[in-house]
A protein has these predicted regions:
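Nucleotide-activated sugar donor-binding and catalytic core shared by glycosyltransferases
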Residues: 1-175
Length: 175
């Protein structure tokens, strides 16, 4: 309170917390909240990707940077394969943000022999892929906010680079 002249919040519900503690506060909003709105586009997104209304859809979002994809996509794809054992009709949408990401994900799918009909579908629309999903498995980042705003359940995963893990494991001890 003593160190803050004015707290700027992203969402209207946040202001009450600061007001309770006597902190000057103003909600400035967030561009994603303004652009995505709160309308549910699940059916429209499924139609766009030629998916059925009753299909079970999981969207996999291992990140948008090459290093993230390299670390997380194999883990996410392994989890997808395990999920197919119990739920063989699952379909997986994998959005990509660039031609390089598309090529990288395609190479991983080929490496893991995961070109099975229409089960693993690459799309160039992350908001549509989130909207179409029953569940989103994603890396920590902006996509978590997008998924929250689009009101989809999510599992957030992250895998540190080896050097970061080595440094962090020396600094942080978890009992």
């Amino acid at each position: 309170k003593r160190a803050v002249d004015l707290m700027l919040t992203l969402f209207p519900f946040e202001t009450a917390v600061y007001e309770q503690h006597g902190v000057a506060v103003k909600c400035v909003g967030h561009p994603l909240a303004d652009s995505l709105g709160f309308e549910d586009h699940k059916l429209r997104s499924r139609q766009k990707f030629e998916l059925g209304e009753d299909d079970s859809i999981v969207t996999l979002m291992p990140g948008s940077r090459g290093g993230e994809i390299k670390r997380l996509a194999p883990v996410f794809l392994d989890a997808a394969v395990e999920s197919l054992i119990d739920c063989p009709n699952l379909k997986f949408l994998i959005p990509y943000s660039s031609a390089a990401n598309h090529a990288q994900i395609n190479a991983l799918l080929r490496e893991k022999s995961l070109f099975r009909g229409d089960q693993f579908i690459l799309v160039d629309d992350s908001h549509g892929a989130i909207s179409a999903a029953d569940l989103v498995v994603l890396s920590s980042g902006t996509a978590t906010l997008e998924t929250l705003l689009l009101r989809r359940p999510m599992i957030v995963g992250y895998k540190l680079a080896a050097i970061t893990f080595a440094i962090a494991s020396r600094l942080v001890k978890i009992p």
